[in-house]
Regions:
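Conserved GNAT acetyl-CoA-binding A-motif
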Residues: 114, 121-133
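Conserved functional loop/turn residues at catalytic and ligand-binding sites
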Residues: 61, 97-99, 103-104, 108, ...
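Conserved acetyl-CoA-binding loop of GNAT-fold acetyltransferases
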Residues: 145-154
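Conserved beta-strand-loop-alpha-helix junction that forms the acyl-donor binding cleft
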Residues: 131-140, 159, 163
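Conserved N-terminal entry element of GNAT/NAT acetyltransferase domains
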Residues: 2-29
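Conserved acetyl-CoA-binding loop-helix of GNAT-fold acetyltransferases
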Residues: 100, 106-119, 142, 146
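Acetyl-CoA-dependent GNAT
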Residues: 25-91, 96, 101, 114, ...
C-alpha cells in the first residue's frame, strides 16, 4: 500500500477525472487498505485484524471479496459477498460489506462492485442478492434503491458478546 501522503496525492489526481475502476479479487497485500476503508464507515480494525479475516474468507469458496482499483492503483472500495444458506429459504447471495472511499463516492465504483456481486450470484444459479443497511445510512439506502433493490423489512439486531 502506498504511504499516506502518496495516497493523498494520487487521490487528488484521480478526483479531477472520471473514475474508472478495475475489479479484481482481493489479495492479502490489500489488508491494510481494506482496514483503512472499513474505518471510514465506523468499523475500525488493524491491518493484522483484516489479514486474519481475509485469510479465512479467501479460502472459502462460498465467500468472495473484490476490490475496485483505479487506473493509478488506488483501491477505491471493496465488497464482500457470501452464499447465505438458511433452512427456511433458498440460498441467496448476501452483501456482507461494501465500502467506497469517501473521496470516490458517487462516481460509479459502488455500482460496478455490486454488479460484480450480482454476476457472481447469477453464475451460481441463485436468484437474489440480499443486503442489510443501517437505518441511519440514508445515502446507502438511496444507492441500493437506485440499483433496483427494495426495502423488504426493518428489524432490530441483537448481539451477545462473550469475553
Amino acid at each position: 500500500m502506498a504511504g499516506t501522503e502518496e495516497l493523498k496525492r494520487k487521490i487528488r489526481v484521480v478526483k479531477g477525472r472520471p473514475l474508472k475502476v478495475n475489479i479484481r479479487a482481493a489479495q492479502m497485500e490489500d489488508a491494510g487498505r481494506l482496514a483503512e476503508l472499513s474505518g471510514q464507515l465506523g468499523y475500525p480494525g488493524s491491518a493484522g485484524d483484516m489479514r486474519r479475516r481475509l485469510r479465512h474468507l479467501l479460502a472459502d469458496p462460498e465467500h468472495a471479496v473484490w476490490v475496485g482499483e483505479t487506473e493509478s492503483g488506488i483501491i477505491a472500495g471493496w465488497i464482500h459477498v457470501f452464499v447465505k444458506r438458511l433452512l427456511e429459504n433458498d440460498p441467496e447471495i448476501e452483501i456482507g460489506g461494501l465500502v467506497i472511499d469517501e473521496n470516490f463516492r458517487g462516481q460509479g465504483a459502488g455500482k460496478v462492485l455490486v454488479e460484480r456481486a450480482e454476476g457472481w450470484a447469477k453464475a451460481r444459479g441463485l436468484k437474489s442478492v440480499y443486503v442489510r443497511s443501517n437505518v441511519v445510512r440514508n445515502d446507502a439506502h438511496a444507492f441500493y434503491q437506485k440499483l433496483g433493490y427494495r426495502i423488504i423489512k426493518t428489524q432490530s439486531s441483537f448481539r451477545k458478546t462473550f469475553c
